Amino acid sequence: MENFTYYNPTKLIFGKGQLEQLRKEFKRYGKNVLLVYGGGSIKRNGLYDQVTGILKEEGAVVHELSGVEPNPRLATVEKGIGLCREHDIDFLLAVGGGSVIDCTKAIAAGVKYDGDAWDIFSKKVTAEDALPFGTVLTLAATGSEMNPDSVITNWETNEKFVWGSNVTHPRFSILDPENTFTVPENQTVYGMVDMMSHVFEQYFHNVENTPLQDRMCFAVLQTVIETAPKLLEDLENYELRETILYAGTIALNGTLQMGYFGDWASHTMEHAVSAVYDIPHAGGLAILFPNWMRYTLDTNVGRFKNLMLNMFDIDTEGKTDKEIALEGIDKLSAFWTSLGAPSRLADYNIGEEKLELIADIAAKEMEHGGFGNFQKLNKDDVLAILRASL
């Protein structure tokens, strides 16, 4: 392992009925609150009324930013920054999934920065201060509820970056599985693809002596693979929703990658795709990840083989390690497809036309690190993976 320091100050409040904890949690930060949410599903399922009721009963003055996009955009962040400054906001509360939380992180950091907020999100500068914020999670997927990272898209320039800082951890996150009951099947699938991808990207590294971390990765993956088909048959099953909700948090709260840094090439490539084509993030991952695996397989065949044997039932008799690994990759792609995820860029009507642009965007992100830590990739490599994904 490499030396490491683990820091995660987020208070995780998990379980049925835990929304009541909001009463005491937000008040220590102030009563002038900006409520941030997405397209309105929290109004349809009653969560909006519950949250605003609690806030107002506890004396909060509630302002709102609604309409956060699935790939949150700079323009929406800037609108939120303006609201915070106009109303002298003390505290932000994100009610939604990863996109809402990512947008809230960006607003919280942007308010405290005197320059162009895009400087932070494009990693020209690091956020050194942020307004306090908490989350009420409604979707198991990104892990943003318990990490400092955020992804913001600049639609004007076709740029999309992952950024983060020690000041952008949520102060608390409330996770009640019942708040995920109304998540539709396709979004449930995307969430599970996303969390599995997070685990893969932490697993693929070149650091020696990480047996415990490897086994923790296997445990999360095995749990999602076992639970996913059952959940899709019973979307309001509390125990199944509970399991997936917790898996999504563990997949990206830093627990799995203590002592090394993984390879985030697939996420970087997908961010480039969805910076040009406004597609679901996890849909892009389901397409790209198996092809990244096939492309980088020879870097460490044994590591691929070990992963696949810990996920799927594969008959190894008479097969080479590479054949076993390739069969596992095929099984992964088939598993995601069986859940309803896409398998080709053509499923989103994406062809050859803008692959050069996408590869250029991905190559620019390489400059910021986190790209190719398992196998170094260049623009030509990215193009090859994209073309294999058509």
From Swiss-Prot:
GO terms for biological process: 1-butanol biosynthetic process. The keyword Nucleus does not apply. Pathway: Alcohol metabolism; butanol biosynthesis. Its EC number is 1.1.1.-. Keywords: NAD, Oxidoreductase. InterPro entries: ADH_Fe/GldA (IPR001670), ADH_Fe_C (IPR056798), ADH_Fe_CS (IPR018211), BDH-like (IPR044731). One of its GO terms (molecular function) is alcohol dehydrogenase (NADP+) activity. Pfam families: ADH_Fe_C, Fe-ADH. One of its GO terms (cellular component) is cytosol. It is an enzyme of class 1 (oxidoreductase). Belongs to the iron-containing alcohol dehydrogenase family. This is Probable NADH-dependent butanol dehydrogenase 2. It comes from Bacillus subtilis (strain 168). The lineage of its organism: Bacteria, Bacillati, Bacillota, Bacilli, Bacillales. The gene is yugK.
